[in-house]
Design a protein with these regions (language model features):
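Membrane-interfacial segments
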Residues: 24-29, 55-63, 82-87, 113-121
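Alpha-helical membrane-inserting segments
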Residues: 13-25, 43, 47-55, 75-79, ...
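Alpha-helical transmembrane segments of polytopic membrane proteins
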Residues: 33-42, 91-101
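Membrane-water interface at the C-terminal end of transmembrane alpha helices
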Residues: 5-9, 100-124
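Membrane-helix boundary connector in multi-pass membrane proteins
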Residues: 78-94
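Internal alpha-helical transmembrane segments of multi-pass membrane proteins
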Residues: 52-71, 89-96
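Loop-to-helix transition at the N-terminal end of transmembrane alpha-helices
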Residues: 28-47, 63-66
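Membrane-helix boundary elements
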Residues: 2-36
């Protein structure tokens, strides 16, 4: 998988997390509001991807997926504190669960599909 495609999927996962969270708390649906909530997490995603050099193997769970997940949550929450946006303990738990499921999940699906294709080819 190309690094740019993986990055787009990761960004979509983070935007989905933010959009669902904003909708569940009845915040406005403005682009500005979405951007205001998303920037700490998108910055964290970028940090996690750079630290793990995810462009080398962007679709693997370790290190790329793990770096994306933990970077998004850890750096994102830290930046939310610095920006005065708040980080309730329950919010951290929800972020860990949702982003873990999505940022690691799509990579698990890609890995499973690759194993299935390899097994199918070896049976021919």
């Amino acid at each position: 998988m190309r690094p740019a495609a993986a990055a787009v999927i990761d960004v979509c996962c983070v935007i989905a997390f933010v959009a669902i969270g904003r909708a569940s708390h009845h915040h406005g649906e403005s682009i500005g509001g979405l951007a205001s909530t998303a920037w700490p997490f998108l910055t964290g995603l970028g940090v996690g991807l750079v630290v793990t050099r995810a462009w080398r193997r962007p679709a693997v769970i370790v290190p790329a997926g793990l770096g994306a997940w933990l970077g998004t949550v850890a750096v994102g929450m830290l930046l939310r504190v610095v920006a005065g946006q708040g980080t309730a303990l329950a919010f951290i738990g929800v972020a860990l669960a949702f982003l873990g499921l999505f940022l690691l999940g799509w990579r698990a699906v890609v890995a499973g599909h690759a194993r299935w294709r390899a097994a199918t080819r070896s049976r021919r």
